[in-house]
């Protein structure tokens, strides 16, 4: 399988001069380089970047690895849609957020997760989840929705059928892209998981035990993760 690391966001909460995917771990290793090398064991790896942050990634990756998706601010779903349109893959694809530290356990989960005509989402049960996923609804806490005390949180990685994702992304854009911007009930971006809320795409939840979630939003969260690994 090929992998796409999504690293084209605005990172408004990270507060750093460099993209958060390029943050350095305590051991001096660059996060995106580590994740690239890990995912490379499963197949070719590509990284989405924006017009603004491409120059930072070129210090570590060649142009063939980078997929420029334009200006930031259109959301993770838009970046996935544009990357698939450029790559035109004919097999299942791993989509991975750039703000996660990938471990051997993550690779094991990706290798063993089912592949369907839709989205397979490895999840784990969490107390007070930041994002809460069910097969038919995704709650986004960052947009102020009331969240359950316990729920299933994604592991920042997904296995997708590129044909289904492209088809339902087009359906989403037809309905929610107006005047040069996305517009949904929770914001003005196309979140990748909006496909669950707003299209009839098939979803398989793979509940995973014994795995640490090394994802982050802020610099402090990254610093804490870097000390743990």
Predicted regions and their residues:
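Conserved core of the sugar-phosphate nucleotidyltransferase
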Residues: 103-182
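Conserved N-terminal catalytic core of the sugar/cofactor nucleotidyltransferase
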Residues: 2-5, 13, 29-97, 102-107
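A conserved hydrophobic helix/loop-capping motif in glycosyltransferases and polysaccharide synthases
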Residues: 4-8, 24
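Conserved alpha/beta core of the MobA/IspD/sugar-nucleotide pyrophosphorylase nucleotidyltransferase superfamily
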Residues: 3, 151-229
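Short glycine-enriched, charge-decorated loop/helix-capping segments at active-site entrances
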Residues: 18-24
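A short acidic, often aromatic-flanked loop/helix-cap motif at beta-alpha or helix-coil junctions
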Residues: 71-76, 127-129, 211-214
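Active-site glycine-centered loops adjacent to acidic/histidine catalytic or metal-binding residues
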Residues: 9, 99, 125, 218
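Short acidic/His/Gly/Ser-rich catalytic and metal-binding motifs that mark active-site loops
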Residues: 10-16, 56-57, 167-169
């Amino acid at each position: 399988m090929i992998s796409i690391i999504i690293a084209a966001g605005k990172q408004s909460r990270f507060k750093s001069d460099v993209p958060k995917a390029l943050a350095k771990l305590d051991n001096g290793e660059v996060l995106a380089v580590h994740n690239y090398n890990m995912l490379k064991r499963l197949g070719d790896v590509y990284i989405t970047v924006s017009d603004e942050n491409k120059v930072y990634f070129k210090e570590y990756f060649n142009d063939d690895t980078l997929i420029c998706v334009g200006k930031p601010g259109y959301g993770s779903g838009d970046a996935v849609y544009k990357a698939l349109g450029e790559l035109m893959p004919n097999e299942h694809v791993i989509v991975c957020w750039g703000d996660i530290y990938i471990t051997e356990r993550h690779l094991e989960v990706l290798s063993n997760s089912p592949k369907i005509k839709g989205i397979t989402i490895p999840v784990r049960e969490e107390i007070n989840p930041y994002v809460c996923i069910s097969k038919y609804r995704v709650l986004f806490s960052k947009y102020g929705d009331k969240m359950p005390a316990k729920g299933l949180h994604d592991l920042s990685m997904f296995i997708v059928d590129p044909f289904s994702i492209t088809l339902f992304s087009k359906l989403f854009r037809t309905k929610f892209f107006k005047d040069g911007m996305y517009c949904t009930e929770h914001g003005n971006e196309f979140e990748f998981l909006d496909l669950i809320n707003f299209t009839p795409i098939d979803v398989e939840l793979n509940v995973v035990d014994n795995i640490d979630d090394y994802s982050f939003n802020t610099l402090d969260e990254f610093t804490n993760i870097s000390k743990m690994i």
